[in-house]
């Protein structure tokens, strides 16, 4: 092989190597910029978000395959639409009087989670998310139930029409009811006043508090009324001054309806996500054993 031939051959080899390097670089670049295929992560378990639109929210929560996607999408929806009021950690924001979604205190549903009851379903959460609380929607939670203001000047027009303009309790009687509420919530209270306050609390001609808060003040979930024995469930404060203001002025918490703000799959996903946070005490999905104790019904 003469010198000229060797030079030409070397150039061809070098050109081939450089060409291969260029092709490899292009392939790497294309791979880096190509959209991520989520099926690579989950394989046969992958569910596209829109597939959550048709199944019931209770079915989604029972299905490992559907639940996986619901938790991912639900967290995203929660962060975008719910965290501003309920907090990034789901524990509520005191200044906004929003409930802790990670505790065992459920409003507008069945038995308390701590009792092991199975009445609490993802569909309970879905209804609240979909229609809101006193949102103006015809299906809103709490539309027919408000905490009545015991001072007539703070009553709504509807309350005045239903209950009149009489002052049901004197200031002294309100003080006695406050002491009873402090006592059942584990706070220091005047025992003599609390004893008289207990009578007023259960008197259907005076305080009539038990009608919404139940005997002993444990609350009635279907009404969304506060469990007065748990200070953590007081959205408006549990000290004397806050309780007094609640009795005098009444309380009417609200939450917007998301029925026309979220896609069907988003609404169901965030409902499942919130359902699995309840009773965990932390912003994370429960362990399988904890989840098993709250397995949703069909």
Where would I find each of the regions flagged by the language model?
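Glycine-centered loop/turn positions within well-structured domains
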Residues: 80, 99, 145, 207, ...
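Sec-exported extracytoplasmic/periplasmic mature domains
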Residues: 79, 83, 87, 106, ...
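Periplasmic c-type cytochrome electron-transfer domains
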Residues: 1-73, 96, 108-131, 143-182, ...
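Gly/Gly-Pro-rich "capping" loops immediately C-terminal to redox-active cysteine motifs
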Residues: 75, 87, 91-130, 149-160, ...
